[in-house]
Amino acid sequence: MQDGSFFAPATVEGSLSLDRVTFLLLSPSLSLWTSDDVEYRRNQQKLEKMAGYIQTVLKDELDPDFPQGYPSQLFRYHYRTLDDVDIQFGSQLPKRKKITDADIIEAFGTVEEKAEGCMYQYNPNYYAFRVEYNPNKASLRSVSNLLESFSCNQNASLIRIARLDVAIDFNAPIMPQMVLCEGMRKGNIHYGPKGIQTIYFGANKSRNQFRLYDKRQEMIDKDGVDIGHDKWRLELQSRESFCLDSVPDHGKVFQRFTFYDGAVATGDWKLDMIRRDAMNYGLDVALRSMPPNTATRYRKLFKERNFKQNVETPSLVYYREFPGAMERLRCDILSACGFEML
């Protein structure tokens, strides 16, 4: 049973930003995966020329402390600018497509594939040039000369977003225990000196994964900077690939995530724990195991304190602020690639 005094309209508003983006440019000649030895050697030569070209065009922009040109896990060459724009090209793995059509498997599958009921088709990855950056901390100006020359013969509709991190910040001490994420299992939970510091929903390799974490504490740990007020961030990491002119509705994913009423912490951990139990079982049950004097004291606190500071629904923040943020990102990418913006 829930006490109605805990419920009220949201007073902690969220603020949305795009925290990280990865986009791909069509580049068939920069893919190393091919069954043709002649084509492989030809593409390898093109990769070497591209590496030399990047070192020339970006010579004043590259981070001297980064091992420039070394391979990454998926690409032959990896470069990083001073403002943390990552450029990778030369895909070393193919694009894999799962086939479940029974007729195709029966006609072309191996004995093992027929038994498993699926087979895989492998093709060259023609999106072999990748750019990754954080729009909050960097722009694409430092690499615009490279992108303009690289994509001069491309159609803007062929630029693909491979990953997009959508962040919603709440300037309040959120209680991670007071959240619900439908259809996504809780993953790793990281604890800090004050309790839960980060909680994940969804698998690491899934198309969508949520992370709720103490942004203030993260900034202290990473940068030694204290912003002076509480800030919790709900971050959606989406690996749903899409073209710039066909953006998926991430709001449907955010609709899975809900803050219970009273999700803002009071600063009194015992009071917050009692409040959480009272939300589920009622105040009398939450106080039942306490000594009479302690129970009376906390019952009085419940009457005196205002628990009506609730958190705005994340999907509402998304639908209010994402369209503008996405349009700004779209303009930034297209402008950096040399397309005229009307």
Per-region residue spans from a language model:
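Structured, helix-rich domain cores that form ligand/interaction pockets
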Residues: 1-290, 308-342
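Helix-turn-helix DNA-binding segment
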Residues: 295-300
